[in-house]
Amino acid sequence: MKRNKIVSILLLVAMTFSIVLTGCGDKKTTEAPTSSPGPTTQETSATNEQSGKATRYTSKETPFVTLNGELKKYESPFYLTSVGQSADVSMLDALMKKVGAEYTYNATAKASDLKDVKTVIIATGASSKGLGAAGISAEDEKARASELLEYCKENDITVIMAHLGGVSRRGKLSDEFADMVLEYSSGIVMVEDGNDDGKFTDFASRKNIPITLINTIADCIEPLKIIVGK
Amino acid sequence: MRNKIVVRNIIVFIGVVALCVISGKDFLRMHKPDPISTSNPGISEIVMLSEYSPGLKGTAADTEVYILRGEKPGGKFLILGGTHPNEIAGMLNAVCYIENARVESGTLYIIPRANNSGYTHTCPLWGMMDIIDFQLPDGSVREFRVGTRLTNPIHQWPDPNYYYGNSGRELKHSEVAEIRNLNRNYPGDVNGTLTEKVNYGIFNLINTEKIDIIYDAHEAGPEFLRVNYLIAHEKAMSVGSMAVMNTNLQGHPFAVDISGATSYGLSHRALGDNTEAMATLFETLNPAQGSRRTKMSRELVLGGFDKNYVEITNRGLLSSGELTEAGISINERTANHMVMCRELMNAFSESNPDRPIIVSNMPSYDDFINKGLENILQPINS
């Protein structure tokens, strides 16, 4: 009997302790469980690999910088397309509208669409969602890009690569798309966050083509005005 | 000896009843709606969602639809708050529009508590806050329930072992609770589960009223990769990108991404696919929703400060949702939603000059930050 009482008292103390523990904190709060469901940290590698960071050229005070030459007006008519189908092409479309550019926009343009075009601005960056929405695979996209870029080369159409997505548009597939376009590019315009490892400035330096680094996407307005002559 | 046992049992019984009464009061409070001020002369009409989904009538999931019509015709904009009730900035944005906006042209349809049943409970073992409050300049206090992201199981039970509804989303194993997630079951079913009836009501409202743009307001924890992103259906990409660009030009570094083709049942996919409307969804950062947060507190929910996430940010372990010592207050999160809504209306008007959506009298971003929600929310009409 006495042992039962001791067990009951111990149980009561344990329960009280548990209630106090879960009820502690603010009046209407409880402690979060360590195993509570929720999203997990992903894609941290880009920010973890900062030891090999490239020199930063832009800042709030210096919103854009052109290396290896000067930013210049390119010849119209302009065409805007994507390689990789990320939403960055849509942002570039909004920017082009903002600066009052005259251009044709088709994110999935084919070589045959570029008749009479003088300058193609290509927003690079892979998006599985974008590819899915367009109903094409990464391989289809590469084939389209290859055909388009070869057409540009054969018809003296200037290619400008635009990389506006920063670090979120770096990675294996995004870099594969960017590499395809870089080989045909006469100029690069990019948000500098995407050049943390110096990939694009190194390429521009090797090929001696101008690269315009931009602090934030909102700072694209002025460089675009120069490119389209507005 | 026997009398002693009887007395002891009676004391224990009374103690248990007392505990039930005390805790029951808290549970019952969650079923009491938080009033919304209707003193704004810009409010034209308040209808119930059951007008668009009759099966909701008389249920805990039926919810108010506030309609603010402009004097001039124009586009129609639907603001959804409380799709996930614990994502509080979305609901507060909707309430701020209801209580302050004047529509000059076009029409606003606002559902502040899209999943009304979700406001009647919190998620067990998640350590959530149940109620937040704001003291207004007149001394009155506005209370808002926090709720949780799913319909209350006392309103929709049991969850099936397997479900494959008309959203195209297959639910099995641990996913079956998502049958009570409003943002997994669009376009809904007029004869389906309670949640699907809400989905159907919103879907039917969009079709019946010929809504042009849908804005589904959400919040997410810091680990979520699309914090401060507008997710837009392909039909909404042009207007969405223009809106996001304008927010960037105003100093708000938001981004846009396209809705995934397989985001079955989510508003930005399913409502975009099944209606004529441009479907968008925006996520603000709410550290209280992160799984690595510290103890739940008022400072965390309203101040948006969490030392764990500041530390995680400082170690460079986040690629989205970075948090500084300044935190991200409920004022700022609600302001971000307000700005995104405003810029979507502006971008729509720019693209459709014959059907503009023009809204005035909304506090500015700086008003939200400097004056706070306590000066933007209106006292409740007596």
Question: What residue ranges belong to the model's regions?
Answer:
Chain A
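Charged, low-complexity C-terminal accessory regions
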Residues: G25-K28, S51-K72, G194-K230
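Short, charged N-terminal beta->alpha structural module
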Residues: L71-K98
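Short, electropositive alpha-helical surface patch
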Residues: R170-E192
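Hydrophobic core
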Residues: M15-I19
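Bacterial lipoprotein signal-peptidase II cleavage site
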Residues: I6, V20-Q42
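Bacterial N-terminal signal peptides that target proteins for export
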Residues: M1-L10
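A short, well-structured beta->alpha microelement
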Residues: M96-D116
